[in-house]
Swiss-Prot record:
The gene is rplI. GO terms for molecular function: rRNA binding; structural constituent of ribosome. This is Large ribosomal subunit protein bL9. Coiled coil: none annotated. Residues 172-192 are annotated as: Disordered. Keywords: Ribonucleoprotein, Ribosomal protein, RNA-binding, rRNA-binding. InterPro entries: Ribosomal_bL9 (IPR000244), Ribosomal_bL9/RNase_H1_N (IPR009027), Ribosomal_bL9_bac/chp (IPR020594), Ribosomal_bL9_C (IPR020069), Ribosomal_bL9_C_sf (IPR036791), Ribosomal_bL9_N (IPR020070), Ribosomal_bL9_N_sf (IPR036935). Binds to the 23S rRNA.
């Protein structure tokens, strides 16, 4: 099916272009969401008459997205999740979780604007791409940790995927003298 795009759609085309797409994509996504019109003579004339309005609306959406991008770009957010000693999460951090974290900070981002190839399944620092507008793309950093203190340590560059790194190593507790007396002969004086 041929459609006229009413806005720029990544990997498809610019506003005003006539492109050929699969019928299901047009019927289920582009047409119901008002992102395209069927390519016929009446709709081409309608598009040309509304072109200035559509371009102004698109420019307004882009400027709003750019304002949010200026505030969000490069920012770091802490996500606290329970994880095993190797750093594997009990569960994962998906696009829905990213939206919740951003909403808690006061940013209204849709789940479809978060681009994660796969859910995050390990603690650490992770870059997440946000597509705020077809022409505005930014990255935020998610600091996935077991606790806020651990997140601070991760932000400083510590690797927290081993037991010693998580809980720390107490050198005094590892001395053999604490467990047995090398001077003793192995017989308890009370028993003798």
């Amino acid at each position: 099916m041929e459609v006229i795009l009413l806005e720029r759609i990544s990997k498809l085309g610019q506003m005003g272009e006539t492109v050929k797409v699969r019928d299901g994509f047009a019927r289920n996504y582009l047409l119901p969401l008002g992102k395209a019109l069927r390519a016929n003579a009446a709709n081409k004339a309608r598009f040309e008459s509304e072109r200035a309005t559509l371009e102004a609306r698109n420019l307004e959406r882009k400027s709003e997205a750019q304002k949010v991008a200026d505030v969000l770009d490069g920012k770091s957010f802490i996500v606290v999740r329970s994880a095993g000693e190797t750093g594997q999460l009990y569960g994962s951090v998906a696009a829905r979780d990213v939206v919740e974290v951003l909403a808690a900070e006061g940013f209204n981002i849709g789940r479809n604007q978060v681009h994660l190839n796969t859910p995050i399944k390990a603690i650490g620092l992770h870059k997440v791409e946000l597509q705020l507008h077809a022409e505005v793309e930014i990255h935020v950093e998610l600091n996935v940790a077991r606790s806020a203190e651990e997140a601070e340590r991760q932000a400083k560059g510590e690797e927290l995927t081993s037991v010693d790194a998580i809980y720390g190593v107490d050198e005094d507790a590892l001395r053999p003298e604490d467990f047995f007396d090398p001077e003793a002969d192995g017989i308890d004086e009370d028993e003798a």
